[in-house]
Amino acid sequence: MSCWTYLGRARGPRASAPTARRFFANFFNDLIVAVSSTVGALKTSQQTPLKMSQDMSHVPEAIRMVLIGPPGAGKGTQAPKLKEKFCVCHLATGDMLRSQVAKQTALGVQAKKIMDQGGLVSDEIMVNMIKDELRSNPECANGFILDGFPRTIPQAQKLDEMLVAQGKPLDRAVELKIDDELLVARITGRLVHPASGRSYHKLFNPPKVAMTDDVTGDPLVQRSDDNADALKKRLDAYHAQTEPIVDFYKKTGIWAGVDASQPPKTVWSDILKALGK
C-alpha cells in the first residue's frame, strides 16, 4: 500500500488512541519496507550499467581502415597486430585475389580469365571481391584493414561508394611514411617465410637460427625482387600511384601519417593514436 493511501486515511474521522497507535505503527512499518524496496531498485539500476560495461569491456571497438605504405614500411608487422587487437579482418588484396582464384569463385574465375590474357583485373571486380569478403568472412564483422587497395583515385571512389552503401564507411586511412634510402637498407636484407608471409631482417630482425623460420623451422628465402635496382622501380611506381591517393584521403579528412622509420613498438603506439584509441 502506498504512502498516499495512508495520507488519504489520515484525513478521515479522528481515530481513538489505540487505533491511532496501530495506524502509525503500520504506517511506518510499510514506509520502511517501501523505502528499502526503492533503495534496492536504485542500487540495481546503478549496478546494471556497470555490470554491462564490465561484461562488454572485452569487446574491442570497431575499426574500418586503409593501411598505406611502400614495400618495407612495416605493414606486414603492424597489420596482424591491428587484426588481433580489434578482432577485424586483414584484407591484403593480393592474397584475397589469389584466394578467390584458387577457390574458383565466380569473381575468381573472371579475374583468372583476365590475368591469363595478360590484362589487369578491373576495379569493379576488386571492389566486388572486397564486398564479398565483408559479407561472408566472419572476421570482418567488427571491421577491416584494407592493405594494397585502393591504388588509384577511381578505385578509391568505387570503394567509398560500396562501403557507404553497405553502411561501413572508412574511419581512417593511415599512411606509414619512410625515406626511400632507409627502405633500401631494410628490404635488401629482408627474409621471408613463404607459407605464412612472416618476415625477418638480417640486421634489424634476424631469426633465432640463421635463414630459419622461428615458428616452423622451415627455410627462409630472399625475394628475387628484393634488390636495390628492382626496389627503386617499385618505389617509383608506388610514389606515382600513392601520392594522389594520399591527397584524396587528406581531402576527405580521414588521413593520418605515421613515421615508419621508428622502432616497431613506437610505430604501433603512433598508429593507435592515429586511430584515436
Swiss-Prot record:
The UniProt record lists the EC number as: 2.7.4.3
Q: Which reaction does it catalyse?
A: AMP + ATP = 2 ADP
The record's Gene Ontology cellular component field reads: cytoplasm; cytosol; mitochondrial intermembrane space; mitochondrion
For the region LID, what residue ranges are annotated? Answer: 189-226
Organism, by scientific name, is Eremothecium gossypii (strain ATCC 10895 / CBS 109.51 / FGSC 9923 / NRRL Y-1056) (Yeast)
Q: Which InterPro entries match?
A: Adenyl_kin_sub, Adenylat/UMP-CMP_kin, Adenylat_kinase_CS, Adenylate_kinase_lid-dom, ADK_active_lid_dom_sf, AK2, P-loop_NTPase
Protein name as catalogued: Adenylate kinase
Q: Which GO terms describe its biological process?
A: ADP biosynthetic process; AMP metabolic process; ATP metabolic process; DNA replication initiation; pre-replicative complex assembly
Domain remarks: Consists of three domains, a large central CORE domain and two small peripheral domains, NMPbind and LID, which undergo movements during catalysis. The LID domain closes over the site of phosphoryl transfer upon ATP binding. Assembling and dissambling the active center during each catalytic cycle provides an effective means to prevent ATP hydrolysis.
**Residues involved in ATP binding:** G72, A73, G74, K75, G76, T77, R190, S199, Y200, Q262
Q: Cite the binding residues for AMP.
A: T93, R98, G119, L120, V121, G148, F149, P150, R151, Q155, R223, R234
Per UniProt, subcellular location reads as: Cytoplasm, Cytosol; Mitochondrion intermembrane space
Q: What class of enzyme is it?
A: transferase
Function in brief: Catalyzes the reversible transfer of the terminal phosphate group between ATP and AMP. Plays an important role in cellular energy homeostasis and in adenine nucleotide metabolism. Adenylate kinase activity is critical for regulation of the phosphate utilization and the AMP de novo biosynthesis pathways.
Q: Spell out the family assignment given in the record's similarity comment.
A: Belongs to the adenylate kinase family. AK2 subfamily.
Q: How does it assemble?
A: Monomer.
- Which keywords does this chain's UniProt record carry? ATP-binding, Cytoplasm, Kinase, Mitochondrion, Nucleotide-binding, Transferase
Q: Which molecular function terms from Gene Ontology are attached?
A: adenylate kinase activity; AMP binding; ATP binding; DNA replication origin binding
Residue ranges, annotated region (NMP): 92-121
